[in-house]
A protein has these predicted regions:
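Helix N-cap/capping motif at the beta->alpha junctions
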Residues: 29-38, 59-60
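Short amphipathic alpha-helix used as the core "switch/output" element in two-component signaling
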Residues: 38, 61-74
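Active-site beta3 strand of CheY-like receiver
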Residues: 43-50, 54
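Alpha4 helix (beta4-alpha4-beta5 surface) of REC/receiver domains from two-component response regulators
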Residues: 58, 62, 85-102, 113
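Conserved sequence signature across two-component system core domains
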Residues: 7-8, 30, 48
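C-terminal output helix
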Residues: 106-115
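Two-component/phosphorelay signaling modules centered on CheY-like receiver
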Residues: 11-28
Length: 120
């Protein structure tokens, strides 16, 4: 199964996406950037679904930049998930290397369709 990493500090969001994707993908979960980066090193997921605003030393945009500037991880597809839906937020994420941007509340089926389209 293809590994997909869900990174969000809200367990209900992780659970919703995990249930939606769990039958087709190996779902990995992390609640912050530190544990997510550890999961990236250990499992090298094909796709990361990454919350923008997270607690800790690194937010989602900083983690995105770390992934996309590292030659060992730059090929991982990253979709940002955020409550911030302004055009400037989308543009900032794209400039840092985001492959997609979903605004909360999002449709888990839409996210799953995007994930499927990237691995087929």
């Amino acid at each position: 199964m293809i590994p997909v990493l869900i990174v969000d500090d809200h367990s209900d969001i992780r659970r919703l996406l995990s249930i939606t994707l769990g039958k087709e993908f190996e779902v990995l979960e992390a609640e912050d950037a530190a544990s997510a980066l550890d999961a990236v090193r250990r499992h090298h997921p094909k796709i990361i679904l990454l919350d923008v605003m997270m607690p800790g030393k690194m937010n989602g945009l900083q983690m995105l930049e770390a992934i996309k500037t590292n030659p060992q991880t730059q090929d991982i597809l990253v979709a940002m998930i955020s409550a911030r839906g302004q055009v400037a937020d989308h543009d900032d994420a794209r400039r840092r290397g985001a492959d997609a941007y979903f605004v909360k509340p999002f449709s888990p089926l839409q996210v799953a369709a995007w994930v499927r389209s990237k691995v087929e």
